Amino acid sequence: MKRLLALLLVLVACTPALAAKKPPYTYFRVGNTGDVSPTTSPGIVLMGGGTDVDAAFQWMCGLAGNGDFLVIRATGTDAYNPYIQELCPAANSVATLIIPSAAAANDPNVAAIMQNAEAIWIAGGDQSNYTNFWTGTPVQTILNAKIAGHPVGGTSAGLNVLTQFVYSALAAQGATSSQSLADPFNRYLTFVRDFANVASLVGIIGDPHFVTRDRMGRDLAFLCRVAANGWSSAPRGVAVDEQTALLIDGSGNATLVGNSTAYFLQAPGPAQVCAAKTPLTYLNVGVQRINTSGTFNFNNWTATGSTNYTVSANAGVLTSSQPGGSAY
């Protein structure tokens, strides 16, 4: 009886510890532990996935006044921490915040961590997690507040959520160009809007991995759906290839860094045929392609040093006005 009583007392004593819950988020930080408040400037990075582009992170660190650099993601690890710290040795700190649920996104500690960041990077992953977990939470609110005066960027899924119109990828797999041209309302094409409030990216839908994964056809379907949703009568798209990043300053002027190209699509109006279970017809969508020697002005939608042409989908068949017929 005494032994049983002793065991019960031990269990009672341990109850608070057993009841203590693990935080719904995970946080890793390297560098200084104290907060700093340097002068910052706004800027947006749209990175096309694949190997990260060093120059893009260095640009962000400069705009952040070498303050606290924060990576946010829904899954994954802290692999960015040593990489960014090496690129930006003067940065006060580099941290990764994993926010895997709405509960985590509503945690006051998550909000406090984000509030103290001078630069925010949205890692690649699954953009449906970002829109499902973070929409309507302090994560979204603080992210948009930071966009107004701080550098913010994203790669792959992180790129997707920074444009006004978002391919939300709610299905189990991403849509391919062949699927999208054959049926622009196929179940893999899902969309949301207004997750991020970036002035230069209003009226635009974005796409990464562009050339590498042959996404021109699906981007025409994106534009058709944006118009069909009533979101824009002449929709626009920005697409960035892998190992490449578009750097947009606070005035809406963009340069490109990395190894490949970026594309700026302008539809002349709604698609001629944009219907469920029907091949897409969308004629004469304008394309401006730039490499690292070109620039782009989002205020007047014009590029310098660009190659300009049109692409069309006719009954689901993609064609281009370029010599040789390449869509890219």
Residue ranges: model-predicted function:
Residues A123-G124, K146-V166:
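Catalytic nucleophile loop
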Residues L4-A13:
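Sec-dependent N-terminal signal peptides
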Residues D52-A56, L63-A112:
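ATP/NTP phosphate-donor binding region
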